[in-house]
Amino acid sequence: MESLTLQPISKIDGQINLPGSKSVSNRALLLAALASGTTKLTNLLDSDDIRHMLNALKALGVEYKLSADKTECEVTGLGRAFEPNEALELFLGNAGTAMRPLAAALCLGQGEFVLTGEPRMKERPIGHLVTALKAAGADVEYLENENYPPLKIKGTGLHGGTVEIDGSISSQFLTAFLMAAPLSTQETTIKIVGDLVSKPYIDITLDIMATFGVKIENQNYQTFVVPANQTYVAPGDFLVEGDASSASYFLAAAAIKGGEVKVTGIGKKSIQGDVQFADALAAMGTEIEWGDDYVIARKGELNAIDMDFNHIPDAAMTIATAALFAKGTTSIRNVYNWRVKETDRLAAMATELRKVGAVVEEGEDYITITPPASLQHASIDTYDDHRMAMCFSLVALSDTPVTINDPGCTSKTFPDYFDKLKELSC
């Protein structure tokens, strides 16, 4: 296995222009494919998850032109649901942002589809979405294990009506159903069961859907009413925001090491909830400056925090490694859905934090981290999880090197992450 050893980083300073958001990129690509008209997406993320979506759309008959650097994509929309002429098997890697929304969208039209992916994808639940789709008239079956991919889907259309979706495990189930619902033949009322996790990701979905011209009534995140027989309309140009989750590593680096880091591509007008990561850093003692399309972090004296991170679970991972540099014990709470991400992130994070010397308590939906007097050099296993690799790169901001196993796993969202980190540390 390839590994990368990062030597201690003595200073951090500079500016980072963020790659496009994974969450925004894949949502916008799917809606552009379903829309009438042509959409030109700029600042599209070039990563594994986006390639899986693009490959699936091409197989489904969608025409698009991708720039040489793969950050601009002109999509000619179908103006309708997918209706390929032949049965298709679509391999979606470990891309939840492709698997869940496509599973819903493929129910709308005609055709037979198998959706599959990497072994980890077959361990990531999808049952709550499938149950809701079946209630709206979909024909979906599990090919291996109940409630998990791979799926076999026969396009029958969705008839809407009142459906329930469990929101307690992943907001992607609701996102997927919301994006399909406007093309249903009858009005759809979606009732949320349990506490809805990651609400800011639903805000991203609703914002992009509105940009593509459809109407939804959001009743305090408990009920969503979606009128029937709507059509997505291409907005023309669509700028993909920078990835706010990816910003967290650079902002944290400034907070830990000093100097000043300016991150552009997100700001106080961002539609991504993960920009709130900067507020968590501020609570730890970092000086934060906000602009419309930038965030600046400057060194503070980092103190431990005890905080509910249900709203920003991805960015919360960065707090776990920043906690290694904070005074006191940090508690990250209400993050059960870490367990159903690219890996079981609670177990993985606890294991790897202990390797560098931290005292860690891992609960069902929380983790507490007490830093050691000095960090130990360790080889960090990344579990084919891009965020594990990027989070633990921050250990190099100490006086100790850190070895990252399988550093290439960052290709899921940020292929040149380690190059960007090096630019800030030169």
Curated annotation (Swiss-Prot):
Keyword Transferase: yes
Entry EC number(s): 2.5.1.19
Transmembrane segments: none
Catalyzed reactions per annotation: 3-phosphoshikimate + phosphoenolpyruvate = 5-O-(1-carboxyvinyl)-3-phosphoshikimate + phosphate
Source taxon at top rank: Bacteria
UniProt-recorded Gene Ontology molecular function terms: 3-phosphoshikimate 1-carboxyvinyltransferase activity
EC class name: transferase
Residues noted as binding 3-phosphoshikimate in the record, renumbered to the chain: K22, S23, R27, S170, S171, Q172, S198, D314, N337, K341
PANTHER family according to UniProt: AROM/DEHYDROQUINATE SYNTHASE, PENTAFUNCTIONAL AROM POLYPEPTIDE
Function text: Catalyzes the transfer of the enolpyruvyl moiety of phosphoenolpyruvate (PEP) to the 5-hydroxyl of shikimate-3-phosphate (S3P) to produce enolpyruvyl shikimate-3-phosphate and inorganic phosphate.
Quaternary structure and interacting proteins, as annotated: Monomer.
NCBIfam families per the UniProt record, alphabetical: aroA
Name this polypeptide is given: 3-phosphoshikimate 1-carboxyvinyltransferase
